[in-house]
A protein has these predicted regions:
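Substrate-binding clefts and catalytic carboxylate motifs of secreted carbohydrate-active enzymes
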Residues: 147-149, 204-301
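Aromatic- and acidic-residue-enriched carbohydrate-binding clefts of CAZyme catalytic domains
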Residues: 44-49, 57, 104-139, 270-281
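Short, acidic/turn-prone active-site loops that include or flank metal/cofactor-
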Residues: 105-110, 182-183, 196-198, 219
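Active-site neighborhood of glycoside hydrolase catalytic domains
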Residues: 96, 120-210
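Secreted/periplasmic carbohydrate-active enzymes, especially glycoside hydrolases
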Residues: 1-101, 131-133, 147-148, 164-170, ...
Length: 301
């Protein structure tokens, strides 16, 4: 990394200074493969929410470094910021420690999903889509760890995402742009499905595709899971255009809660654990490779 110093001056001298760390690398898609500095890479990725069991969705620098160190221990080389731009410090740390980043815009309308009434097709929401795509690129453009822009998550497809793709490309032609619902009929540079099975992956990868296959979510890490990872990676190593994916997800989203009057024991809780009304989606807060306190689940190995 290099330090870039920028100063502004008026007739009385320097008025303001700022410095950032920058790096130089090239990212492109060529021959159906994602290339970094001219060489194909295998994405051994994880999707990560910003989460701490004691502070909720507030994480410190120490928390971030701990997550990166665990990722390095587990041979994870890429992270998708699901499903929003992360704390700016996260990208600086990914630059320093060497993690590839898929930087995701804060666009999620999960409740609408893919039906005719989804917000991707509602032009009243186009400005909101464009604003969120624009802001993530403006903010994170100078981070070399960011190799792919993501337009959002599970929000259907339509003219609002087509416009977002065009906007991002006009702002930054040096990085690929991906969006999972657009893989068949929309605009996306990466073929980035969710939870494709082995046969679907092999069918696509063996068809001499123009776009690389990198699953944005796969190997759902809930409970006794991830037993099929070897079969996926046998295919990844067999077909050059199949270049990996992002495991859903990195860490359980749960909060530390005392389970004894003395506070000497605890459990990890979420959703309906706090009252009779369950606002969570059953057990879908705890899908991590690691537990909320960062201990490793068996399938982490």
């Amino acid at each position: 990394l290099y330090t870039l110093n920028v100063s502004s001056y008026d007739k009385n001298g320097r008025t303001e200074s700022a410095s950032i760390e920058i790096g130089f690398r090239d990212v492109c898609i060529q021959g159906g493969q994602l290339l970094v500095n001219g060489k194909p890479v295998l994405i051994k990725g994880a999707d990560r929410h910003e989460m701490n069991p004691y502070k909720g969705y507030v994480v410190t620098e120490a928390d971030m470094i701990q997550d990166i160190q665990i990722m390095k221990q587990l041979n994870i080389n890429a992270v998708r910021t699901s499903h929003y731009p992360n704390d700016p410090l996260w990208y600086t740390l990914c630059d320093r420690y060497g993690l590839y980043v898929v930087d995701e815009a804060n666009v999620e309308s999960h409740g609408m999903m893919y039906g005719p009434g989804n917000l991707a097709k509602n032009l009243d929401f186009q400005k909101a889509h464009l604003d969120r795509a624009r802001r993530v690129v403006q903010r994170d453009f100078n981070h070399p760890s960011v190799i792919i822009w993501s337009l959002g998550n599970e929000a259907g497809d339509g003219p609002n995402f087509a416009a977002s793709y065009d906007l991002v490309k006009s702002m930054d032609s040096s990085r690929p742009v991906q969006y999972e619902p657009a893989i068949w009929n929309g605009k996306t540079d990466i073929f980035c499905p969710m939870y494709y099975d082995y046969k679907d992956c092999e069918r696509y990868a063996s068809s001499n595709p123009e776009r690389p296959l990198i699953q944005c979510e796969y190997a759902h890490a809930m409970g006794n899971s991830m037993g099929g990872l070897k079969e996926y990676w046998d295919l990844i190593r067999k077909y050059p255009s199949y270049q990996g994916g992002f495991i859903w997800d990195f860490v359980d989203q749960a909060l530390y809660w005392p389970s004894s009057a003395e506070g000497t024991d605890h459990v990890f809780v979420y959703g309906g654990d706090f009252n009779d009304y369950d606002p969570s989606d059953n057990s879908f807060c705890c899908n991590g490779i690691i537990a909320a306190d960062r201990t490793l689940h068996p399938h982490a190995y």
